[in-house]
Amino acid sequence: DLVRSRGLGDVYKRQVCMVLSALLLMKNSGEEIIYVVNTGYQSMDSVRLADGTKVMLNAGSRLTYPKEFSGEKREVQLSGQAFFEVTPDKTHPFVVKTQKMDVTVLGTSFEVFSYDGDEEGETVLLTGKVKVEVLESNQQKGGSYVLKPNEKLTYSKTDGISLTTIDADAYSSWRQGKRMSFKNETLEMILERLEKWYGQKIECAPHIARHYRFTFTMHSESLLSLIHISEPTRPY
């Protein structure tokens, strides 16, 4: 049966909606089995790849990966948000390919946020070193960037590419369970994350969304309750 559900434990069993499908792709050397994992709204899932790499997928994400890695690189494709703990292998770099950027590592832990169709994407590094290749488009020039721990690269169709220093562990705390932590983040960025988690469109005037910043941590609150969670830290 190619369609089934699984969870991360009893806490998630009722809310995790995951579809696992196997696609057979014919190649000259024979058949290669490709797996596609999709997570539903308000759900997460974990995947262990053939090389031992651990991947945690957040809500509304899709990961495509081979049953076995072959060739010079270990390549996977991502649309969404995922945290990677990559098994070191200097002779076979690990590459996460997205619609906006390619992230190459040898062995490290990092997060990629890049949904197909969105105008923004991020890479956050916790440990080790990664090289981010931002893909060139009609609206944005590409480029190559090497990140150090606690650095975040942000790609924006309107604002270009930026590098900032953050607390990467806190920023990626969603992987520890149904929890998201925001520290002095713009309302615009927060609403984007909440839309992905709850699967609902949240409308807010652009001049307000970009004007205020919030600091708070959410666990498994309803979307309605989050409306009253915090006062803005200050406009900038």
Sequence positions of predicted segments:
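A residue-level detector for the "anchor" residue at the start of short, highly conserved motifs
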Residues: R6, D10-S230, R234
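Short, well-ordered junction/capping motifs at the entry into regular secondary structure
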Residues: D1-L2
